[in-house]
Amino acid sequence: MRLILIRHAQARCNILEDDALMDAYDPHCELTEAGIGQAVKLRDEYPVSLTPSVIYSSPLKRARETAGIFRGRYPSVPFVEDERLSELKAPESFIPPITQGQWDLYLEQRIRSPHLEIVKGLESLDVQRERIERFYKDLFRKYAEEACNIVIFTHAFSIQLSILFFLGLGNEQLLQWQIKASNTAMHIIHYDPTSGSFLLESLNNRSHLQTTG
């Protein structure tokens, strides 16, 4: 079984200036024109050897839009949205509004104190990790007997936590090192259900974005 984890393409909420005001966490943030171009390149240059057996996606709009463009090449492949692939859960509104810089600080604090809800309604890193682990455990049970390629569209933190889970490492490792998760980059992992072992074959693969023409 191969897992192909892909971060969504560039979205408007990814390019905010540090002093930009946020009155809410935006799950409906749309792709930029550059992001649409990234998703098109991913679709067109995606390796035939990794043709998907099934496609999973976070329900957040930026992930769904990326998956939707990708699926243009694979319209008959089963598609599943799973809430457990969402980015962190956050308050419906910030009163008073916060800046993008303050939001980034909250994300750093989640790493330093993974068991804490930094602000009311902001999901802790540990809770996020737990739901992602549940997703994979269910996935492995469902496809344990199949030689398949499973494409998963999700978010940067979800990819970080997924890889920690595959390696059997705790969230505290994020204080020491992190794995870059660029927009539309592929992280390819082979899973052997017999031994329960993982092999990281490629991380943050952006080769499709290097093509010209």
Swiss-Prot record:
Keywords assigned: Antibiotic biosynthesis, Hydrolase
Q: What does it do?
A: Catalyzes dephosphorylation of 5''-phosphoribostamycin to generate ribostamycinin the biosynthetic pathway of butirosin.
What's its EC?
3.1.3.88
What is the designated name of this protein?
A: 5''-phosphoribostamycin phosphatase
The family annotation for this protein states: Belongs to the histidine phosphatase superfamily.
Q: Cite the SMART domains for this sequence.
A: PGAM
Which reactions appear under catalytic activity for this entry?
5''-phosphoribostamycin + H2O = ribostamycin + phosphate
Q: Where is this site: Important for activity?
A: 62
Gene this chain is encoded by: btrP
Taxonomic lineage is: Bacteria, Bacillati, Bacillota, Bacilli, Bacillales
Q: What pathway annotation does it carry?
A: Antibiotic biosynthesis; butirosin biosynthesis
Protein source organism: Niallia circulans
Q: What CDD domains does this protein's entry cite?
A: HP_PGM_like
Q: For this protein, what is any one GO molecular function term?
A: phosphatase activity
Catalytic positions? 8, 155
Question: Which InterPro entries is this protein grouped with?
Answer: His_Pase_superF_clade-1, His_PPase_superfam, PGM_Phosphatase
Pfam families tied to this protein = His_Phos_1
Q: Does the keyword Hydrolase apply?
A: yes
GO BP terms in the entry: antibiotic biosynthetic process
Q: What class of enzyme is it?
A: hydrolase
